[in-house]
Amino acid sequence: MKKLLALLLTFALLLTSVSAVLAESEEEPAASEAPEITYSNDEITVAVTTPLTGNFFTNMWGNLSSDLDVRNLIHGYNLVEWDTEEGVFLPDNAVVSDMLIELEKSDDVKITLTLYDDLCYCDGTPITAKDYAFSLLLTMSPVIKELGGNVRTPEFLAGYKDYINGTAKALRGVKLAGDHRLMITIRSVYLPFFFQLGLLDCVPYPASVIAPGVEVADDGNGVYLKNAKDLTADTLKETLLDEASGYRTHPEVTSGPYKLVSYEDGKAEFEINPYYKGDTHGNKPTIKKITMICKTSDELAAALKDGSVTILNKVTGTEAIAAGLQLTEEQETLTSVSYDRTGLSFISFNTDRVPLDDLGVRQAIAYLADRDSMAEEVLGEYGVRAGGYYGLGQWMYLLLSGKVTPEEPDEDASAAEKAAYKTKMEKLGKLDLEEIEPYNRDVEKAVKLLEKAGWKLNENGEAFDPEKDTVRYKKTKDGLKALQLTLAYPEGSAASKALEETLVKSLAEGGIELKVEAIPTDELFPQYYRQEKVKYDMYFLGTNFEVVYDPSLYFTETKDGHHQWKTNGLVDDEMWQLTVDMRKTEPGDLAGYCDKWLQYQERIAEQVPVLPIYSNTYYDFYPEALEGYEIAANISWPQAIVSAYFEE
């Protein structure tokens, strides 16, 4: 079963070489006329299409894919790693020398991790168990919330609630035993957990840099911060958030294969971390310097052609992909790979704002939005309208869509193994993605929903006439209210035309006036994550889901004990419970997990806190001479680049 999950996740990341036979005009120069570009291990430049915003510390202030790439490049020595062959999380063999799992009398599970004593930050400072404990304690500190960040809520840790509520001085679920031994206790109520050791996902952070004067201590009852009075919002504003030197944007002491040496004007520069001992497979980086920049889709092919960029990562859009493929046809020195996205682009409704607090209005928008045309305009043949809140590359979709079939047992397998396989296939066969409401475009259905919700008048208070009226109105205690909505999307998005023209026009057919505005990402995401005041009714953005897919983390508990989706305001205990049921699936029970995942997708479609727009295929373009760039065995280019090199 573990092997099957590994197969599915590897398939989701699988990169297949692509080629295209494209017509060439007589005026086009022959490939031999192109200037010769020399590549070396001295330096490369990677171009991405999502701007870097400087969230290089954690995802607490945002989680754009480009910022995540930087974090994967400079923060290393995670306690665990995803093993693509076994399909499970395992201790990172470069970090953990020994692991012991014990069942306690309370049925809690204690995991003792012994760390190697040769781990260092990029400045040579030793890394100990205290650095991991500090990472946990800092990211769950209420001071983070004062600074506009999303506080981590590791509810799986024993003693979490007592510690976070201030009724306990120490976090008893994390203990120290010397400099290189860490004991983590998982609450029994949080088990089973489908991704098992994925709960131990943790990288070290230097307390001496982020919180000078603060130390991690353990008097036998669990870890706590000594001199915690020094961990104030004012202190962290300087050490974390200072625009010129704060650890959030300029982390100088880090643990990954590369260290950040410069970040300015949206461009980041990295050099090899000389103290990096290597990953679990012994890989150490060869390429000395990396520059990471953001370019618009129409700039990508030219930059690769003239050699100013070495790798184009996650290219989307019909024109950009076509230009890249044509370039690989013209120049044999260049190649490309494609892989299905493990996420999607979507519209997030702020369901606690009028009129989107009305389910009927959200459903009406779903029926009105011409998502097929939007996907076609933006992606052409390289994407499709999203069928739910998932990506084409997620293993759950691949399994239920039949794109991946579980491997049959060997002929010499036992009768029990064959029976288990048959049962599993029967369970999977009963699951159907078509159970998710597709919201195929239907103006008539949308109009009925709007009228039922009271939006049936015109600006004069008379019955709305679609032949002559444009905007619907509703009678409220404050008078007539127009059905006018606002939507913000990131500047430079390839979907700008689809949003400003196609979406606006399709909603107008139902009597909804939509005003669309492009805003900088450093304005959009703080609003989306509700770190700043929400100014729009809807946000258009994209996401790629992590390997540890635990949507229960999307929710927070309200003061009256209900559960609210943090980014869109939807209060839905049933949806939250479905996410809890998902994570508590027994490890290896793929059919059981997919069953709960499908119910979760159906609930999202029913309540419409988000409207899935499209998912797509990504393309990477890079020199043929770049050896070892094995994306299929990795999750992102920073992980693949560690083993990549140019033969010299």
Describe the role of every protein-language-model region.
Residues 45, 128-135, 179-183, 257, ...:
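Alpha-helical secondary-structure segments
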Residues 47-106:
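N-terminal lobe/hinge region of extracytoplasmic solute-binding protein
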Residues 97-152, 177, 183, 355-357, ...:
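Aromatic- and charge-enriched surface segment that lines or borders ligand/interaction sites
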Residues 149-234, 404-416:
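Surface-exposed binding/hinge segments that line
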Residues 190, 198-285, 289, 443-452:
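Gly/Pro-rich hinge or "lid" segments in bacterial periplasmic/extracellular proteins
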Residues 244-249, 266, 275-324, 513:
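Ligand-site clamp/hinge motif
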Residues 264-265, 425-428, 433-443, 454-542:
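Ligand/substrate-recognition segments at binding pockets and active sites
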Residues 267, 368-423, 447, 495-504, ...:
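Detector for C-terminal structural segments
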